[in-house]
Every structure is written in structure tokens, then in C-alpha cells.
């Protein structure tokens, strides 16, 4: 087993996380490594987390925000939990988007958190419900105030 990097927060996400990348260190101590990419699919994020784990690059806290760009299955959530099984703090973020799979993805995430008690939920979907002003007109990507709120919620979820 490769040791984790103490004091490092590893984050993997898509363009929503990318929109907050400049704010993600706010309220956090230690090193923040965020790898967020436009149109990232769940399987690519899982591959990255597996690579970080296997090479000793993974922090002792991990935040995952995937599922905006396609389905996230129960099997993939279980795989995620398995990859991160030795990580003391794991947070998975729900999605907010205009796609038909949004509710299915969020249900998978909520069920996964119930199945894996060591995984925490950051319910971005619920947090954004009263704050349409945090998002651009596409209902998904972050305005500056949304990026600040996202970063604050991420920091809070890690405490």
C-alpha cells in the first residue's frame, strides 16, 4: 500500500470544479491539488484517482465532483470507494445541470454515501437550489459568486 500525502487535499472534477479552481484553497490549510477538466467523464476521473493512489500522489483528503457529463453508476461509485478506501476523508459532490441524467447521478451518489459510511456527501444540488445567481444561464457552470460559494462548501465539507 502506497502511503498518502499528509496535509494534501486531492480534488478531481469536471468543468464545474474547474470554474472554482482559483478559489479552492480558500479556507483550507495545506496543499491543494485540483485536477478538473472540461467534459470529464466518471471513468476518466476514476483512472486518475487510481493513478494518484498507485503512485503515492493521493492526499489524505479527497474531493470528487463527477457526473455532470454523463451517467455515474452504482458500480462506479463502489469502485470509487474501493480506490479511496484508505483515505481518511472522502467527499463526493452532487451535480446540478440541465441534463436528463442529473437526478439519476445524484441518486447514485446519495445511495453510494449510504453504502459507504466513510464517504461524505456535499449536496451541491441542494445548496444551489435557492441560488440560481451562483450559476450561469446554463444552470451548471459557476459565476464568480458561485465559485466562492462552491469553494466555501468544499472547505466546510472537509472539516
Where are these regions (language model features)?
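Conserved SGNH/GDSL esterase-like catalytic core that processes O-acyl groups on lipids
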Residues: 2-79, 97-107
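Catalytic His-Asp segment of secreted/periplasmic serine-dependent ester chemistry enzymes
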Residues: 102-159
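A generic structural signal for ordered alpha-helices
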Residues: 2, 58, 87, 125-128
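Short conserved AdoMet
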Residues: 57, 85, 114
